[in-house]
Amino acid sequence: MTYHNKEKQEVLQELNVQEATGLSSSEVKKRREQYGENRLRAKKSKSNWERFADQFKDVMILILLAAAAISFVVACVEGDPEGFFEPLLILLIVVVNAIMGVMQESRAEKALEALKSMSAPHARVLRDKAESIIDASELVPGDIIRLEAGDFVPADARLLQSVSLKSEESALTGESVPAEKDAGACPKADAPLGDRSNMVFSGCSITYGTAVAVVTATGMDTEMGKIANLLEGADDGQTPLQKRLAQLGKYLGILALAACAIIFVVGLANGLEVMEIFMTSVSLAVSAIPEGLPVIVTIVLSIGVQRMVKKNALIRRLPAVETLGSASVICSDKTGTLTQNRMTLVETYLDGETQANKLETKPSEEVKTLLRLGTLCCDGAVVFDGDKEQHIGDPTETAIVLAAHKNGMPKESLAKQYPRLAELPFDSDRKRMTVVCRMDGKLVAIVKGGFDVMEPLCTSGNLSQARLVMEEMSERALRVLAVAYKEIDKIPDEKSMMTLEGDLHFCGLVGMIDPPRPEAKAAVARCRKAGIKPVMITGDHVVTASAIARELGIMREGDRALTGAQVDAMTDSELDEHVESIAVYARVSPENKIRIVKSWQRKGQVVAMTGDGVNDAPALKAADIGCAMGITGTDVAKGAADMTLTDDNFATIVDAVREGRGIYANIKKVVGYLLGTNIGEVITVFTAMMLWHKTPLLSMQLLWINLVTDSLPAIALGMEAVESEVMTQKPKPKSEGLFAHGFGVRIVLQGVMFGLLALFAFMIGEKSTGTVAGGQTMAFAVLALSQVIQAYNMRSEHSLFKIGMFTNKKLNQAALLSIVLVLAVLFTPLRIPFGMISLSPQLYLEALGLIFIPVVIMECSKAFGLIKHQH
């Protein structure tokens, strides 16, 4: 139900309450039973045990558990104590992986808690004809409340009385200037939140004036509660990387099960023992599953997070790193994100001039006079504490005060030099403020207000030219105030104070704006170069938003600007049809923001949303990646976001995109490296079983290769430096698979190469030693060491000679350690539990020659253009 479009008496009648008496205690009790407490509902979060259980839903993990179970059964049947080592190792790997998953996913749901903390703890209420202070949670619709400057609004309420009332609503509406309120106003039913001047909203604060209001909504029914509902409803979803890895796991699982089934049938048909077939199946399952992949991807993402922290971007969810690299649209809030969230005086106009001029570093005496008069007619103040500024009061006033201060006229000094003797405070009816000061022995009345209300009060000055200048400044989204004055003989009595506001001399205009951040324009240009479309979504007026967007390069020729009301009038299909041509959305609601984000998502785009207010939180959560501001951002926005920009610098998001793209490229290298080796292992085990009914590699040997030998170089690959050209490429399409542009084919071919190499090594080893164990030892040595060397090939699609063979120091260290671990198994008693034997020096030399074959083949492929660098 809406109340802003109804007269006061009608609202009181609907809520069945009288302004003079308030609700009775019995009525309050009934309504509390009906509406509940004035609190926001908490969303139940998963326990760590539930999160731990969720880790075991992955297909790859389930297959590993099945392999462990089979190994355990075989060990029990055979009664071999050493046989239990293998299932215990697999189980340990699975549990460690699950614990890491819980650690990364278990983040507290802070958004709703932060919304709760914004609720007012107490309220001044009228009940049973008596005024009292109660806990805000006890309010019910129909309660009569009193508000004054400094109060938090405890619930949504319709104003009944107001005196010079202003409310800070930027968290809800995105407007940087406190909203003027008027109990007598009656906006239209479809008026956006920021235009409902006869309403105050829960969680906002009163910055000026006093009021009496009737509560219209409490708890989850308030505007803040609606946002809480949206936060609950917004789906966290999966990132593209999560979806692709999950899909990969399913494919590998199906492949492993199919191969195991074939081996089982072939083994039985050839009269092999069931236990031997089981153990071969376990080996095949282990070879098909890249056990270390989930953990290594997590580690690579964690490394990326550490890099981003150094660039002032704090990641809350690891997969968000990859999503950011895929971002193709950035929907950005204006206030505090693209702009400084601080009104600044940028232009002045003096009576008699032809146009407005930018405020110079060293202004003329006439401009100083304008600033002096304007400052004397301000209640706002700026307090300096070292390099920090604290702005107190109305932002337009603090802009004037700060401009005067920077030009050698601190307000404190002016107040002492020209003491204020009388005043007429600003109110919403007059829309102006008047003071009387003693200046150089004379009494001077100074009046400040909007030009439209000041023009009829002035009898001297070129007002027609001033109006033209004012209109031109307003078109450029400047907030314009006029300053006028007159000398008086004496201060009139209280009844005649209004006579001060007449027969004035027009002095000039001051133009203020919440200016763009200095670095924002360059950041927008870098986004466009990277193929990312910037879109402004704000609660501010469309003229202001469009002006800022044009200045920053967000809005270009042919682009459109829409209001929230226009978005409401469009169906989803209509919005989808026009969304690509709309650069600015103004006066939008939280629901509008979510619709805009989802419209882009339906277009197949990966959407990043930046913001700092409560009103941004639902869209931050609905977007593929939400980026909150760390300094000016509310706790609600930070709780809903995936990433926080700790310096509130819009340009930081561009650096984060660059890192995200680099990290995705590194993850792709890691996936390619691990899958290439796994495919080689599958081909080795499957082919040997089909052709010779033998197992060329035991499951223990495969686990050592996958989890020890391969994992260290894979992690180092994930630390590869970001390639220079990443920010000149377009974002990869949302539908683009992990194996696009022939990447999957190359992985399979590499797997075939490793498979043939291992089979050849097995044949040589078995023939030379006369034992299967000799063949397995030879296959292990060649496969393990050649895969370590292969990590260097995977660094880039450019030749190793072009990028420098040993320029990745982390990879050099990882490769050296992996080689040491392989040699430890080959040349120490550790080889015994791994089922290997000592080979002759001749065989070791032959193995050494075989391990460099992949390097030669890959370098030749790069040289002949078979592997092309993808732009």
Regions of interest found by a model, annotated:
Residues P733-V752, V772-T777:
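Membrane-water interface at loop-to-transmembrane-helix junctions
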Residues T709, F754, T777-A791:
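Generic alpha-helical transmembrane segments
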Residues G604, V657, R661, L756-S768, ...:
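Alpha-helix capping/termination and helix-coil
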Residues M1-T728, L738-F739, V752, F780, ...:
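Conserved cytosolic headpiece of P-type ATPases
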Residues V77, R746-A761:
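Alpha-helical transmembrane segments of multi-pass integral membrane proteins
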Residues M689-M700, F762-G775:
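Helix-coil boundary and interhelical linker segments in multi-pass alpha-helical membrane proteins
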